[in-house]
Every structure is written in C-alpha cells, then in structure tokens.
C-alpha cells in the first residue's frame, strides 16, 4: 500500500510563507482579522504541522492545497492501523509522529500513543499514573480531550486522572492531579498551549476553575475559581489590538481572562446550560455556540466588566450545534446542528441565515466531529463515517459524500496533503494514491 510522501525541507519554507501571506489576507475568516481580532497561533514549526485541537489555526481551517476530497474505505487509503482501547480525541501531529490518547479497561487505564506518519506503526504507548475513573456518558470517553504539543513535549488531559506531559520519545516529564471531575458527562475539554503555559478549565458541581500550568514543570502559574457547574469546552487565546485574551465559553456566560494572570476582563450573558463547542473568531467578533437548541452569540471582545448590553453584536438560535464546533470562512459562519443533522450558513457580520440544509437522514446526536475547511470546501463527518463535502459560499452545493465505512466521532488532522482520521477502532491515512 502506498506510503505517506516524505517530508521535504523546502516544505517548511513554503508553509511559513503561505501562513504569512494568509495572515495578511483580511477577506478570510482566519489569520489577521480586519477587526483587529485573531486567534493566537502556534510559534515556529507549529504552523507546519497539526499541533493542537482544530489545527494550527485553532479553527479547523487548512490553508495549503493537495488534499483529496474523495475517499472510501479503500480509495485513496495510504494505510490503516489499529488503535487499542477507546477514545474520541483527535490526532495531533509533529514531525514524523502522530499522537493520540486512549482509554482501556473501562477507563481505569488511560494512555498517550504515538504512531509513525509514514506507515502507521505504533511507536510507543505511555500510561498515566493510576487513579480512579469518573463516570462518563456512554458516548464519551476518558480519552475525549485532544492533546497538544510544542515539539518538545506532548500534553494530555485525562479529567480526574490529571494532566500528563511526556517528551516526544514517550518519557514521562510530569503529572498533575487537578482533582476529581463531577459534571455528569465526564471530561472533554482539550488543553491550550499559550506561550509556556498549559491552560485548561474544568466546570463541574463545586470547585470549578480555570488554570495555567508551567509547561515545563506542571506547576501552577495561576488558578481562578469559576461558578459554572457543567461545561466541556476548550478555551481559546485571541489577540485583540495590543493585548491577548483567554476566552472561556461555558454555562450561561462567555468570559474573558488575562491569560498571564487569570484575572477576569469581561463577561457576556446569554449561553445555555450545556456548552461543548469551541469558539471561533472573525470580523472582529468571537462566535460562541451553546446547548441543544442554541443560542449562538457574536461578541465584540476588548470590553471590561459585564458587556452583555454593549458588546453583543448579534444572537441567534438558528442551527446552533450541541457538540460540533463552528467554522468561519470568509463572510460566513457554518454550524452543524447534530440534533437534526442540519448545516446552517450564517452571515458572520449580521447573524442572518444564508442557507440551511439537512445532511443525510436526520439523526439525534448523529454528528460529533467538528467541520473543517479545505480548498474552499466544507467537510462535515457524521458518526457513521460519512463525510459530506460542500462548496463554501452563499449557495448550498453538495459535491459528494465519502463513506469511510466505520463509526467516526473524532475530528481529523491534516498535514502535507494527508488526512489522518480516527475511527472507533483505527487510525487511517487518506491521501492521493
């Protein structure tokens, strides 16, 4: 079976140049935003790979070309490999290594795995220190959170089992017990690497918090208590003019913190009780989705105190997702309502519905993976492993449907023309054969 193309040195130069150009492109929903608001991106070589949840953009947007847009369980498959255990975390990639988390023995054993990008071989398998497993929803897993890496260490969160850092050879660097999670669905939010800090929040029944840990040692840099009782999202770091903000979208409130000190900057009311999607940014706004029936909020960051009456640009319940995160591209915000298998295209500036269509047969909670944008196309994968490929823009156009033939809850990773897709039992590399 064909192998993944080798990584060539000149690809780094091309990717850095491309990323720089994209940062200067104000018309798109990524890079340097025309409103002076943009996602804090990885340093150095992090732009070249897929080092975190939703990739270097943090928003599920792929900027380079050469990826196939058609596949099946046999077509354009470069390799397949079995993944031990169970988990819904997405792959992350650095250099020639892929990293995943997994759970075995009914959650009593949680691990970080490393695979070879070239052929899918399992390189190493490292367990987190022993601990008590918490309750998780039957669609969740103790290995739901996607790891992150800075090219020196891989950082993974396992809920009640704590935070783990290993080097790229699989040697344990540090482990932190962050307390037991009690939020009735189990862990899910992924850690965020910001400068030399690992930031994560855990909203639960008593003792909710957001914290920053020293990436090198695991020691606490700061910790801020929170009031939310449930929440499963991933924080984002954004640049707003001359300063950075840490955005936490959770139960009832969207809150902004100083990522250096943990001090709250502002809060905006209007979210529902259950919040899973990761916020995205574009056009000077932060877009936050909540709950099984919305709403989605568009907030102008940079305020202070309660900004509900001053910085909430628009609010809608049209097409809001429960699990999948939205994606913004150009002038449009795309959301996938997994409660009814409906994709909605909104005008990002106004919140008005541009189009709304159903993808396949309606199924309650039938889509878990977050959508990605590749080559001006929107890719939406349902739990059955069907990927709907749509043209981006103001008109709905379904190009085709790819069926990988396996249950798929994890979001993909994309590097050097290859899709890396985690199914329920396998890791699959999809490229142009």
What are these model-predicted stretches?
Residues 1-13:
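N-terminal secretory signal peptides that target proteins for export/translocation
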Residues 8, 21-23, 31:
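Short intrinsically disordered, low-complexity segments
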Residues 10-12, 19, 272, 405:
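Generic alpha-helix initiation/capping and coil-helix boundary signal
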Residues 13-15, 36:
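Detector for intrinsically disordered, low-structure N-terminal pre-sequences
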Residues 15-27:
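Bacterial N-terminal signal peptides
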Residues 29-433:
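Noncatalytic, solvent-exposed loop/strand surfaces
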């Amino acid at each position: 079976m064909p192998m993944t193309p080798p990584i060539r040195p000149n690809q780094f130069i091309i990717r850095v140049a491309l990323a720089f150009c994209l940062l200067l492109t104000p018309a798109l929903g990524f890079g340097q935003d025309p409103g002076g608001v943009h996602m804090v991106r990885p340093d150095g070589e992090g732009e070249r790979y897929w080092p975190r949840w939703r990739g270097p953009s943090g928003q599920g947007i792929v900027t380079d070309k050469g990826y196939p847009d058609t596949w099946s369980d046999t077509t354009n498959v470069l390799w397949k490999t079995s993944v031990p255990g169970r988990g819904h975390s997405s792959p992350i990639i650095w250099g020639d290594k892929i990293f995943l988390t997994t759970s075995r023995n009914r959650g009593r054993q949680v691990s970080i795995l490393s695979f070879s990008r070239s052929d899918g071989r399992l390189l190493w398998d490292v367990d987190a220190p022993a601990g008590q497993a918490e309750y998780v929803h039957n669609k969740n897993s103790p290995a739901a959170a996607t790891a992150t890496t800075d090219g020196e260490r891989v950082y993974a969160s396992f809920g009640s089992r704590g935070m783990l850092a290993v080097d790229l050879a699989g040697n344990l660097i540090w482990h932190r017990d962050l307390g037991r999670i009690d939020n009735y669905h189990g862990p899910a939010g992924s850690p965020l690497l910001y400068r030399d800090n690992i930031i994560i929040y855990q909203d639960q029944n008593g003792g909710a918090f957001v914290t920053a840990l020293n990436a090198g040692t695991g020691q606490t840099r700061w910790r801020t208590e929170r009031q939310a009782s449930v929440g499963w999202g991933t924080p984002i770091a954004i640049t707003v003019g001359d300063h950075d903000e840490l955005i936490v979208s959770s139960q009832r409130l969207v809150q902004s913190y100083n990522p250096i000190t943990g001090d709250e900057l502002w809060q905006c009311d209007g979210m529902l009780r259950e919040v899973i999607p990761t916020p995205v940014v574009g056009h000077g706004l932060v877009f936050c989705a909540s709950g099984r029936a919305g709403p989605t909020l568009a907030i102008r960051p940079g305020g202070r105190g309660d900004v509900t009456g001053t910085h909430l640009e628009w609010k809608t319940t049209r097409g809001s997702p429960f699990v999948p995160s939205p994606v913004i591209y150009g002038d449009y915000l795309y959301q996938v309502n997994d409660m009814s298998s409906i994709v909605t295209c909104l005008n990002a500036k106004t919140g008005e519905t541009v189009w709304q269509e159903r993808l396949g047969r309606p199924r309650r909670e039938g889509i878990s993976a977050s959508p990605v944008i590749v080559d001006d196309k929107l890719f939406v994968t349902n739990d059955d492993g069907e990927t709907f490929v749509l043209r981006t823009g103001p008109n709905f156009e379904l190009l085709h449907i790819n069926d990988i033939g396996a249950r798929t809850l994890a979001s993909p990773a994309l590097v050097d023309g290859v899709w890396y897709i985690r199914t329920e039992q396998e890791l699959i590399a999809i490229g142009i054969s």
